[in-house]
C-alpha cells in the first residue's frame, strides 16, 4: 500500500497535469471591479490599501513592543481617528477597508468629473507625474513590487492627482463652473488670513541644538520688546512697503545677533537677514497656533509691532493689510485658490464618488486582502 504522503504527491501531480491539459492557469485578478464607469485596476486598489494601512498604523493602539510593521497586530488593534466627518473607533482591518474605499471613491470621482468637464493635462503635468513615479520607484520600488504595486500604477495614481489639481481650476478658476470672484478673494484675505511682517529672535542655538535656559530666555524677551519699540518708533517715518522692508532688515541685523550672543553663539549681521521676512498666514497656517496668535493680533491691531513667543523664537510681529502688502493679482497667481477651495473640492469629490454605482468585486478584494501587506523587503 502506498504511504499517505505518496498518495498526496500523486494527487497533487494529477491536479497539475489536469490543469496543464485543459490550458487552465491560476491567476490573480487584474481589476477589482468598478466605481461608476471607472475601472479600478488591482495596482490602484493595492496602492490605496497600502496608504490606508499606513494611516491605520498611526491610529492604532498597539501593545508595548508592537510596531507599524506588525501587520497582524495593526489589523487587530483598535484604531481611533477621523474618516471624513465621522469620528471612528474600530479594528484596524475595518479602518483600512473604510479608508481604502474612500480613497477609491475619490479616485473614481476625479476620473469621472475630469472627463465630464473636458479636462486635459498639459505635457508638463504628464511628464511630472512620470518623473515623480520614477523617483519614487528608484527609492521604494522593491517595497511596492513586494506589495503587487507596479510603477505604472504609481504613475496612474499621480496622474489622477494631477487631474484633481486641474479640477480646482475647472470648478473655481477664472473660466471655471463657479469662479471665485474678486470680492471672495478679498473677503478671504481680510477675514480669514493674516499678513505678518516679522523679525524672529531665536531661542534655539542651531549649532549646539540647545534651547535657551530661563535667564537666556528673559534676556531675549527683553531684546524683543526693545526691537518692537524701535520698529514702532521707526514706523512713524515710513512712507510705504520699501521703507518698511528697510526697517525690518535693519532691526534684524541689530537684534538677531544680540539674541545669538545671549545664547552663546556668534552670528554675522548678514546671517540675521534669514530671521526677517513677511508671510501670508492662511487658516491652515494659523491652526497650529490655536487662537493665541489671532488673539494677539486682535489685541494689538494692524501696523503695530508686538512680541509673540513662537516656541523656537520670540517673534517681533506686525500685522498689515494683505492688500497693502501685495496686489490682488499677485495673490491670484500664487496658490491662494488651493488654500481657499481645496477642502471644498475634496468634499465634493468624496460625495460624488460615494454616490456613484459601487461595483467592487468582494472576491477579488479578498485576493488582495490587507493581511498580505508587506512593510519590509
Residue ranges and their predicted role:
Residues 70, 74, 99, 223-226, ...:
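Charge-rich, solvent-exposed alpha-helical interaction surfaces
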Residues 2-11:
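Bacterial N-terminal signal peptides that target proteins for export
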Residues 26-28, 144-225, 280-377:
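PPIase-associated folding chaperone regions across multiple families
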Residues 226-288:
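Peptidyl-prolyl cis-trans isomerase
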Residues 26-149:
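N-terminal targeting/tethering segments
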Residues 19-23:
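C-terminal motif of bacterial Sec signal peptides marking the signal peptidase cleavage site
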Residues 26-27, 36-42, 245, 249-255, ...:
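Cross-family detector of peptidyl-prolyl cis-trans isomerase
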Residues 18, 107-111, 164:
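Alpha-helical transmembrane segments of polytopic integral membrane proteins
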